[in-house]
């Protein structure tokens, strides 16, 4: 009663306040305070997160589906969209972050080294172009594949914008759905159907070269390789049966789409993604069984797609590593073996056996992967240096490093290394300028027979491309950024579906990075997936657990 009288005196009331009226006043004050707090959170703290989600949706959902009526304009069309929209989002993000500075302690960024290396890479790109006086060809990339300075800065800005937010589970579902739509459209095109009129203005015989809204079949397959692990992560690590079935269905469609591209990089990348998901699935036998089933489905995708392509009206040709494995029936054999291992994991789990720990499983499998890689490199060195006369047949295209290695990639790699060796010290350090590779390599095109498919405006190796255009500084930042992102995601992934999927995606990107060109859709997707993983880490750190289960 003493406290009540004090409150009444403060309000200068003459009539005593009842207990019920006092409680009503307290509740009303608390409700108003809560409403004000929520409104402030939406207007200030949540605004950067909203812009981050919009940017991620644009880069990973809208951009792959953007399409122009002429196939040869796909690159330029997507690049122009990025260069128009991302700067506006960056301006909004900067304004929102200034408004959100309330003096409260911010959540520290888990990937600080990754962000610094990205910044260093962008600085290296600017320096390389500054040495040319910011020539227009270096800004818009018109002499290459349109990965000029402006586009690279926009992709870097998108990386920082997406990484500043907190990825939600619904966004992940939307990304997977959009990637599945791209894969379905590519499968329809590969089977000889053209529902959207893609081939109306294309030359006869080139229908098998372009698939879906991505364009060239090589980039179509490698794009799906980067998105396949996000769906696979849902199947392997999700605790909800519905999400597991959703993830498996989408992953199977994307695996078939990747095999429809008929490329070595898509085939290798798909299996690298499955291997990475299996390597980090330790600690739970059912989870390991899911990873083995996913890998088995990926193995079955090659023979299934090869049979389906036989009925296509366009009659696409299968060559290289996919044809070799199809003729050997390796996909069917590996599928049966993996399904048997998955059944063994389920049987052991029902008998109460424990799975090996996550760290031990990852250490053993990644060690085996490292030994297999060293063995492959040693075999290549042996047949390239020691036993150069042995007839290897079709295997020579990837076991003997010469001008014909990797569908003429060896020719571009060797000339790129010669050009770098002949460059001056300043150019070696800072590069010749973005997308000026053709100028650098043209004096070294000494074998006209190797140019029957066209000249090389890219050495078909992204680190080599960065070495020629951005110098040692740019290449070192690019490679270290990849390594830092991979280590960060592996260290924090645990059994979070999105983080594990992002790790597998970055791990599979290694083959894309080594044997593919620096293509706009690949760079944009790669940087965005890396940022998606970092934003998921921020969300995990703020909530203290897995946050990517819708």
PLM feature segments, named:
Residues 18, 24-26, 30, 43-44, ...:
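Alpha-helical transmembrane segments of multi-pass inner-membrane proteins
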Residues 72-78, 139-144, 217-218, 262-269, ...:
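Membrane-interface catalytic loops of GT-C/OST-like multi-pass glycosylation enzymes that act
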Residues 352-395:
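Long, low-complexity, polar/charged, intrinsically disordered or flexibly structured peripheral segments
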């Amino acid at each position: 009663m003493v406290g009540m009288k004090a409150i009444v005196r403060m309000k200068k009331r003459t009539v005593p306040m009842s207990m019920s009226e006092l409680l009503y006043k307290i509740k009303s004050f608390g409700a108003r305070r809560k409403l004000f707090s929520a409104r402030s959170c939406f207007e200030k703290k949540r605004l950067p997160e909203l812009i981050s989600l919009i940017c991620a949706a644009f880069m990973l959902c809208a951009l792959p589906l953007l399409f122009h009526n002429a196939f040869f304009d796909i690159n330029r069309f997507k690049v122009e969209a990025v260069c128009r929209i991302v700067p506006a989002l960056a301006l909004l993000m900067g304004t929102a972050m200034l408004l959100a500075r309330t003096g409260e302690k911010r959540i520290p960024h888990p990937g600080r080294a990754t962000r610094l290396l990205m910044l260093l890479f962008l600085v290296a790109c600017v320096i390389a172009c500054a040495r040319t006086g910011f020539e227009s060809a270096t800004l818009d990339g018109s002499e290459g594949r349109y990965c000029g300075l402006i586009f690279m800065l926009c992709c870097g800005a998108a990386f920082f914008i997406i990484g500043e937010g907190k990825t939600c589970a619904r966004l992940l579902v939307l990304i997977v759905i959009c990637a599945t739509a791209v894969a379905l459209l590519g499968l329809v095109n590969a089977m000889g159907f053209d529902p959207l009129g893609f081939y109306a203005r294309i030359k006869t015989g080139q229908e098998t070269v372009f698939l879906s809204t991505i364009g060239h079949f090589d980039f179509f397959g490698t794009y799906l390789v980067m998105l396949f692990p996000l769906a696979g992560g849902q199947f392997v690590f999700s605790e909800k049966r519905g999400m597991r079935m959703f993830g498996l269905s989408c992953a199977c469609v994307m695996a078939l789409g990747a095999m429809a591209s008929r490329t070595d990089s898509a085939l290798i990348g798909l299996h690298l993604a499955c291997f990475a998901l299996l390597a980090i699935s330790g600690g739970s036998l059912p989870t390991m069984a899911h990873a083995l089933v996913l890998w088995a489905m990926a193995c079955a995708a090659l023979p299934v797609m090869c049979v389906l392509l036989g009925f296509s009206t366009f009659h696409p040709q299968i060559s290289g590593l996919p044809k070799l494995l199809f003729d050997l029936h390796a996909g069917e054999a590996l599928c049966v073996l993996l399904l048997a291992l998955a059944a063994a994991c389920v049987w052991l789990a029902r008998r109460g056996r424990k799975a090996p720990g996550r760290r031990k499983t990852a250490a053993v499998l990644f060690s085996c992967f490292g030994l297999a890689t060293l063995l492959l490199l040693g075999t290549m060195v042996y047949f390239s240096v020691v036993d150069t006369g042995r007839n290897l047949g079709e295997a020579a295209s990837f076991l003997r490093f010469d001008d014909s290695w990797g569908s003429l990639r060896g020719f571009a790699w060797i000339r790129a290394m010669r050009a770098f060796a002949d460059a001056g010290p300043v150019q070696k350090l800072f590069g010749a300028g973005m997308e000026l590779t053709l100028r650098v390599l043209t004096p070294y095109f000494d074998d006209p027979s190797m140019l029957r498919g066209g000249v090389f405006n890219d050495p078909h190796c992204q680190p080599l491309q960065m070495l020629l255009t951005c110098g040692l500084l740019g290449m070192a930042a690019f490679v270290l950024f990849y390594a830092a992102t991979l280590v960060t995601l592996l260290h924090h992934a645990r059994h979070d579906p999105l983080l594990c999927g992002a790790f597998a995606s970055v791990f599979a990107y290694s083959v894309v990075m080594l044997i593919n060109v620096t293509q706009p859709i690949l760079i944009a997707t790669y940087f965005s997936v890396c940022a998606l993983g970092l934003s998921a880490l921020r969300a995990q750190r703020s909530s203290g657990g897995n946050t990517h289960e819708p």
